[in-house]
Amino acid sequence: MTEEHVVYIGKKPVMNYVLAVITQFHEGAKEVSIKARGRAISRAVDVAEIVRNRFLKDDVDVKEIKIGTEELPTADGRTTNTSTIEIVLARKT
């Protein structure tokens, strides 16, 4: 999967990311990856479920879900663990 078929979830409203995912599929992508970390993980799950159940109901399915942990440096030089998720949506064949 190329980097252009990745949607990074942040603090914007959920529907902004839903539109980004739908746009990727309409431009011909076979798979779209939704990535988030920390507090944005629940928003990423919401995006995947809205796309899968409301907009592209018969066309898209969850192919893979990866979870993990990243160590991020803090301002005082220490590191903190942050949870990550990647949800791969694939067009049904």
Curated annotation (Swiss-Prot):
Subcellular localization(s) per the UniProt record: Cytoplasm; Chromosome
Keywords recorded for this protein, A-Z: Acetylation, Chromosome, Cytoplasm, DNA condensation, DNA-binding
A biological process term (GO) from this entry: chromosome condensation
Modification comment: Acetylated. Acetylation at Lys-11 decreases DNA-binding affinity.
Keyword Transcription regulation found: no
One Pfam family of this chain: Alba
Domain of life (superkingdom): Archaea
UniProt keyword annotation of Acetylation present: yes
Modified residues (N6-acetyllysine): 11
InterPro entries associated with the record: Alba-like_dom_sf (IPR036882), DNA/RNA-bd_Alba (IPR013795), DNA/RNA-bd_Alba-like (IPR002775)
Gene Ontology MF terms in the entry: double-stranded DNA binding; RNA binding
Gene Ontology CC terms, in alphabetical order: chromosome; cytoplasm
Protein family (similarity comment): Belongs to the histone-like Alba family.
NCBIfam families named among the record's database cross-references: DNA-binding protein Alba, PRK04015.1
General function of this protein: Binds double-stranded DNA tightly but without sequence specificity. Involved in DNA compaction.
Name listed for the protein in its UniProt record: DNA/RNA-binding protein Alba
Source species: Pyrococcus horikoshii (strain ATCC 700860 / DSM 12428 / JCM 9974 / NBRC 100139 / OT-3)
Gene: albA
